[in-house]
């Protein structure tokens, strides 16, 4: 089978290094998670989710209604928060998306967001809807093969930049490499993702902190045992080893079992996580 072509555009800033991050960190859990999604007669999606971590339990219920290019999400959480999000796709022009998020009872945390995807650019702007808002902007320029971008946030209340990051990436049909400068220039991370075959991929990330002069090196791999079952493993230079197996026992319904072991303290009990996602 021929390899798929790289994406037509550079995507958003959050897409830089995403393939390596997903391979190394996505779906690894050390807690218990349960998610159930059903659909009402009017097409509304209703999702109930619960997470148990240590002795604490967190739950939420979310409803999503779509009508043409407009969607409305309402989410209620067990800590008495209600968040309503309005999303409009292709807002006046293809590739332009508008998002309005209104939390309750913390209305001062409301924010408006605009995203624009172009074959040679990906832009994202967020502004808080209060008297002294936090303003965020990220931009990526280039193509699906090579992209460079920046991500900044400015607090109008203090007049300070709370975030300024930069990144670049190179993508081919089978390989993605990225370099990110994060934490106001304090940390530098290089990542690599390689699809070595139709069923297997490997990835690595090297992160350096300038303030602590500490390096973190993480290796990972994933392999599809068959069309429904995937296994993953990772290891870092601090001796932390993790593995998971994920099985799609029915369309869109997944069970994931993961474990984490400190190989430098093997006498300590390992951590085990379980995730169950049910969709009709």
UniProtKB/Swiss-Prot annotation:
Entry-linked InterPro entries: Porin_dom_sf, Porin_Euk, Porin_Euk/Tom40
TM ranges: none
Induction (record text): Not induced by osmotic stress.
GO MF annotation: an example: voltage-gated monoatomic anion channel activity
Keyword Ion transport: yes
Tagged with keyword Cell division: no
Location in or out of the cell: Mitochondrion outer membrane
Keywords, in A-Z order: Ion transport, Membrane, Mitochondrion, Mitochondrion outer membrane, Porin, Transmembrane, Transmembrane beta strand, Transport
Expression sites by tissue: Expressed in roots, stems, leaves, palea, lemma and pollen.
GO cellular component: mitochondrial outer membrane; pore complex
Family stated for the protein in its record: Belongs to the eukaryotic mitochondrial porin (TC 1.B.8.1) family.
Domain remark text: Consists mainly of membrane-spanning sided beta-sheets.
Role summary: Forms a channel through the mitochondrial outer membrane that allows diffusion of small hydrophilic molecules. The channel adopts an open conformation at low or zero membrane potential and a closed conformation at potentials above 30-40 mV. The open state has a weak anion selectivity whereas the closed state is cation-selective.
Protein name: Mitochondrial outer membrane protein porin 2
Source taxonomy: Eukaryota, Viridiplantae, Streptophyta, Embryophyta, Tracheophyta
